[in-house]
A protein has these predicted regions:
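Hydrophobic ligand-binding cavity/cleft-lining segments
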Residues: 1-62
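A generic structural micro-feature
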Residues: 18-20, 75-77, 102-106, 118-120
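Intrinsic-disorder/low-complexity, polar/charged segments enriched in Ser/Thr/Lys/Arg/Asp/Glu/Gln
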Residues: 21-27, 70, 80, 93, ...
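A short, structured loop/turn motif at beta-sheet edges
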Residues: 32-36, 86-92, 113-123
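Hydrophobic/aromatic beta-strand elements that line small-molecule binding cavities or substrate pockets
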Residues: 26-28, 81-87, 98, 108-116, ...
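Glycine-rich portal/gate segments that line the openings of hydrophobic small-molecule binding cavities
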Residues: 30, 49-50, 58-103, 155-171
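A conserved amphipathic terminal alpha-helix motif
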Residues: 2-8, 129-172
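Short, solvent-exposed aromatic-acidic interface loops
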Residues: 99-103, 127-134
């Protein structure tokens, strides 16, 4: 995890982490929950299988440095996917990249952002960026099912963060 290149003096820009296009733009509104609590739930690798429908198991690496976080998620369909946190600025946002032998999304980078809109209320955003879905069969399959899988997963996440109004906009 790192806070570079964004600092308190410079605004955050996803372009500092990827040039891939936005493919999925998702959000969950939450109430009666602090942004820090929402961030803690979404940012905890051990909780991924509690809400993401394709996640079977998560193994977090021992941190090699104080500011690094890497872990591996075993997914139905994708197998083992490595996730590396590129930016960690709790409770506002984090950015991670994901890759794996059977992970069809090339140059995948995601942004998780929590915005407080009122005391103990706000919006959790999850944006997925990638250049392509590798393979014709994967393109046909994932362009149809990925938005729905993520929506179902965010509905499950909503139960953990007192969320509602799940929205998924696909650019696939």
């Amino acid at each position: 995890m790192t806070s570079a290149p964004a600092t308190s003096d410079t605004p955050f820009a996803i372009g500092d982490y990827t040039s891939a296009p936005l493919r999925l733009d998702m959000q969950v509104r939450f109430t009666n929950q602090s942004p820090a609590t929402v961030f803690d739930v979404m940012g905890d690798p051990a909780q991924i299988q509690n809400w993401y429908v394709l996640a079977k198991d998560t193994v977090v690496d021992e941190q090699t440095a104080k500011d690094e976080l890497q872990f591996e998620v075993d997914f139905i369909l994708f197998g083992k996917v490595r996730e590396e946190v590129l930016l960690w600025t709790p409770p506002q946002r984090y950015v991670y990249r994901a890759f794996g032998e059977h992970f069809p999304f090339k140059d995948y980078v995601a942004l998780i952002e929590v915005e407080e809109t009122a005391p103990n209320a706000g919006v959790l955003r999850w944006q997925q960026y990638f250049t392509e879905i590798e393979g014709e069969d994967n393109q046909r399959l994932h362009s149809v099912i990925l938005p729905h899988l993520n929506e179902v997963s965010l509905q499950r996440l909503a139960t953990l963060i007192n969320g509602s109004d799940v929205s998924v906009v696909s650019h696939l």
